[in-house]
């Protein structure tokens, strides 16, 4: 996978003939200089800085609640600073090619922490029609991200379709992260044709989060899923 995959494979978040929500959405594909990027981030934070994942409101336990907002809750562990931009709640649309079956999907991705040296990763994906309307659930994926002192990323993921995966990788730069399958296990009722692969996550010029997943098919990597997500909390 090349770094350019992120811009060539990830669809725009205003797919399905949606009107752009604001001028920054309409110009998402346009490169920004440093000052423009900072100004855009400040503008966007006015809508998301006060939002967070809701507490459970159950009996207290002697542990900190998860937070997807770096302004609220426990401080981010110093060991996670290289992953800091990922923390938040992200939502948008994407495209999938699952062994020849192509479909569009919506996704909400929560990347949260509780002050310990890991990030919680929680993805929910639903299928959508050509107008962007939901036509039913697709899959869920939960797991944890860790990173060593040498900037080696370790990811464990469990997928509701019957998949367990361990991935390793490293930051591409301070706004992009690439991971690769080290072990992919499919359960007896899971998708037998699902092979190992690579993922690339990165912040786009408009500060949305894009990601690309490529999987081995017929001996070579092929596009599997990709999406572009807008920060809605954090």
What are these regions (language model features)?
Residues 89-95, 122-124, 144, 156, ...:
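Residue-level recognition of well-ordered beta-strand positions that form the cores
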């Amino acid at each position: 996978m090349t770094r350019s995959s992120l811009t060539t494979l990830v669809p725009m978040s205003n797919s399905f003939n949606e009107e752009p929500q604001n001028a920054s959405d309409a110009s998402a594909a346009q490169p920004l200089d440093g000052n423009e990027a900072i100004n855009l981030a400040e503008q966007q934070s006015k809508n998301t800085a006060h939002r967070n994942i809701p507490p459970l409101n159950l009996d207290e336990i002697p542990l900190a609640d998860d937070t997807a907002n770096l302004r609220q809750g426990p401080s981010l562990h110093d060991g996670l600073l290289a992953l800091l931009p990922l923390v938040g709640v992200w939502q948008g649309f994407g495209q999938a090619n699952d062994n020849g079956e192509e479909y569009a999907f919506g996704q909400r991705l929560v990347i949260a922490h509780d002050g310990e040296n890991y990030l919680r990763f929680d993805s929910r994906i639903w299928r959508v029609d050509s107008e962007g309307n939901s036509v039913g659930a697709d899959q869920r994926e939960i797991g944890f991200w860790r990173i060593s002192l040498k900037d080696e990323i370790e990811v464990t993921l469990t997928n509701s379709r019957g998949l367990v995966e361990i991935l390793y990788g490293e930051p591409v730069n301070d706004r992009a992260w690439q991971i690769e399958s080290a072990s992919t296990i499919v359960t007896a009722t899971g998708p037998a044709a699902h092979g190992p692969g690579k993922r690339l996550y990165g912040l786009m010029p408009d500060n949305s989060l894009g990601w690309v997943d490529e999987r081995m098919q017929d001996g070579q990597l092929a596009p599997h899923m990709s999406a572009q997500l807008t920060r809605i909390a954090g």
